Amino acid sequence: MANFGCEDLRSQDGESFLYFAYGSNLLTERIHLRNPSAVFYSVARLQDFKLDFGNPQGKTSETWHGGIATIFESPGDEVWGVVWKMNKSNLSSLDKQEGVKSGMYVPIEVTVSTQEGKEITCRSYQMTNYESVPPSPQYKKVICMGAKENGLPLEYQKKLNSIEPNDYKGKVSEEIEDIIKKGEAKTH
């Protein structure tokens, strides 16, 4: 893993960076809760990685009540996501959201390919110590909404939709419940 200071991560203005999202931050409204500078840059594919869900350090997410997304190296697999262009001023809030200080995730550099075939280096996050468990229905829904909103490939959307969630039937945080309700209203 290379150092975050790599030139490829920065846009030409030097004030922003590129972030590859593959979990709940696929959804525009979700990423904007803590990172208002995020602007859609591209749909992209991360080759030789696989999506998984887990409890970081074996602890259930108090926000999502189930496994949360991570990626791990897996030759021949791929993870689709969204590249967001973000102002460097949001880097600390993104790290905080991803639980970097508590050791939930570590920032990594990944090289992704856009649908046009352009390769770009982005910041992303990966859990290093987790127990695989299914996501809550609400978390799965937010990821699927983001995949649909941003036009991830239909086959990948089907794969996301086929993920078996856990049986959590309670509520998640109010701000997330609001996002889910707004998303459901758009599709009806």
Curated annotation (Swiss-Prot):
GO annotations of cellular component type: cytosol
Molecular function terms, GO-annotated: gamma-glutamylcyclotransferase activity; protein homodimerization activity
EC number annotated for this UniProt entry: 4.3.2.9
InterPro entries to which the protein is assigned, alphabetical: G-Glutamylcylcotransferase (IPR017939), GGCT-like (IPR013024), GGCT-like_sf (IPR036568)
Tagged with keyword Lyase: yes
Entry's family note: Belongs to the gamma-glutamylcyclotransferase family.
Assembly and oligomerization: Homodimer.
Protein's UniProt name: Gamma-glutamylcyclotransferase
Lineage, highest ranks first: Eukaryota, Metazoa, Chordata, Craniata, Vertebrata
